[in-house]
Amino acid sequence: PDCVTRAISLGTGADYRDVQKMLHINGDEKDCDDLCVECYSHMLDEIGYPKLDGNKKTVSDLCNEHKNDTLLVRIEGHLTCCINGNCYDIWDCTGKTVDVYWLIID
């Protein structure tokens, strides 16, 4: 479950603890589990990050297509972060199929 907080913190540059608090507040407001995709998806949408369909691409495919972007990438049961064409995670999920992803815009 730490993957959600870690990916959002890395992708947005926000402090890890601040992201935890934001997720908790969002979960309370939406009456959902802080770390479930339906819950954090609402938060990212409200912040204004465009949500895009993964179109059955792999994490690696997206990294290669977005070499100058920051992405939050959802695969089944996991959220990861790609920055400037590199996937940053504690395990290699680059071969996994993307469900949806968010383009992080400053």
Question: What would you call each of these model-derived segments?
Answer:
Residues 1-48:
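Active-site nucleophile-adjacent alpha helix/oxyanion-hole segment immediately C-terminal to the catalytic cysteine
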Residues 15, 58-62, 89:
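Short, solvent-exposed coil/turn linker segments
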Residues 21, 30, 51, 56-57, ...:
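Context-gated lysine
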Residues 45-56, 87-89:
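Short secondary-structure junctions
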Residues 53-83:
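Active-site-adjacent substructure of cysteine-protease-like catalytic cores
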Residues 73-99:
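Catalytic Cys-His active-site segments of thiol-dependent hydrolases/isopeptidases
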Residues 99-106:
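Charged phosphate-binding loop/patch that engages nucleotide di/tri-phosphates or the phosphate backbone
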